């Protein structure tokens, strides 16, 4: 999430394949068909935490919904030249038809904080796994002492996307992608309620990062203006799992206007025929979608993915149900089904999302570069060679074309 959709030209792919075939080199294609990481099965890259989109399309020869692409035919034509004598490639099966679904409203709403399960009591902060939960979101709640001054709240290692509320009012959103962990607390009365809602976004699944606990994995502290640090204790912890039974079992109420805090939204649409479709999520902020009880996957407004693939076999003639857990509130609680996906619409606002906080700017005034050059266009390793030994602090790359 928050990065450009991965693509590669058919020309480059076929060129690389031909070179290996001509040299009798074994290889595999990553991906021939990427498919979809349904539900919460999307992982994350390492070492810098980079959660993977629900779509695993990867601009592959066979696209997310199983349809062949122009790139597929280029690969097929190439491979046909390397078949043993007398063999031929099999026929291409027919594609599953796609359908459009007219815009429909999700005007039944259940506010998350009004539909919490029974809490678990814990003196100290612990990770999500300590409360027998592996995916989804988790809510940590405690009360704070009185303070006449502002204080700094520090949440150490919130994995992966946290919202902080004080007496029901949202104070901040903290993203692991941006390395955020501090919030300024306003003056408050004794017993003010602190809520920290943390969403797990996908585990790093290789290398040292494979030990990727979720929730708040270390500690929560407040620091006064005179530097006194207090570790917060006595937590009520609410599991918010991702199973459909939990999402469905809510007290939904009619609500036409969008809310700006976490809530479940429910709506239905009618079909005369079924087929694959792509739910357009551009009205929604961040969350999870279920269709007819199936966990379709995560969405996030920052993109680049703006649609969710729904296989036609999970739809039915007649009434179909959609439930959405939206963590920050939609622009409008409505959606539609498209016949083509939107996988390359990056909507990151402001400065570089993953690497720069608000107010942080790189000032190179007066600095002289020790070397300036360009890379040639194309794939493969390229090297930078300095004419002499140099001392450097920054290595900057600028995209000259795309």
Residue ranges, per PLM feature:
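Carbohydrate-binding surfaces of carbohydrate-active enzymes
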Residues: 21-254, 327-330, 394
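Noncatalytic modules at the cell exterior or secretory-pathway interfaces
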Residues: 186-198, 313-326, 388-401
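The substrate-binding groove and active-site-proximal loops of carbohydrate-active enzymes
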Residues: 1-12, 16, 57-70, 304
């Amino acid at each position: 999430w928050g990065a450009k959709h991965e693509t590669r030209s058919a020309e480059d792919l076929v060129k690389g394949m031909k070179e290996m075939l001509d040299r009798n080199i074994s290889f595999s294609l990553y991906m021939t068909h990427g498919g979809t990481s349904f539900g919460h099965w999307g992982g994350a890259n390492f070492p810098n935490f980079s959660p993977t989109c629900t779509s695993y399309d990867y601009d592959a020869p066979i696209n997310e919904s199983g349809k062949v692409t122009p790139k597929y035919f280029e690969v097929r034509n190439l491979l046909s030249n390397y078949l043993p004598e007398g063999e031929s490639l099999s026929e291409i099966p027919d594609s599953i038809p796609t359908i459009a679904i007219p815009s429909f409203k999700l005007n039944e709403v259940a506010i998350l904080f009004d539909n919490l399960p029974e809490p678990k009591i814990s003196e100290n902060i612990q990770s999500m796994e300590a409360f027998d939960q592996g995916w989804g979101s988790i809510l940590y709640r405690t009360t704070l002492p009185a303070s006449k001054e502002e204080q700094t709240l520090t949440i150490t290692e919130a994995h992966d996307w946290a919202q902080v509320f004080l007496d029901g009012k949202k104070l901040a959103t903290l993203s692991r992608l941006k390395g955020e962990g501090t919030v300024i607390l306003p003056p408050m009365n004794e017993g003010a309620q602190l809520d920290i809602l943390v969403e797990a976004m996908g585990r790093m699944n290789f290398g040292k990062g494979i030990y990727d606990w979720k929730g708040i994995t270390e500690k929560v502290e407040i620091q006064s203006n005179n530097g006194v640090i207090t570790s917060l204790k006595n937590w009520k912890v609410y599991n918010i799992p991702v199973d459909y039974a939990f999402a469905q079992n809510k007290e939904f109420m009619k609500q036409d206007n969008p809310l700006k805090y976490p809530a479940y939204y429910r709506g239905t649409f009618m079909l005369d025929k079924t087929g694959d479709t792509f739910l357009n999520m551009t009205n929604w902020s961040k969350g999870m979608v279920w269709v007819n009880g199936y966990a379709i996957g995560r969405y996030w407004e920052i993109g680049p993915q703006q649609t969710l693939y729904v296989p036609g076999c999970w739809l039915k003639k007649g009434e179909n149900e959609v439930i959405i857990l939206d963590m920050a509130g939609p622009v409008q609680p409505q959606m539609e089904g498209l016949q083509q996906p939107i996988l390359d619409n990056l909507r990151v606002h402001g400065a570089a999302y993953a690497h720069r906080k608000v107010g942080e700017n790189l000032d190179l005034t007066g600095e002289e570069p020790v070397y300036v050059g360009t890379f040639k266009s194309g794939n493969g390793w390229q090297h930078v060679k300095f004419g002499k030994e140099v001392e450097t602090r920054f290595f900057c790359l600028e995209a000259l074309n795309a």
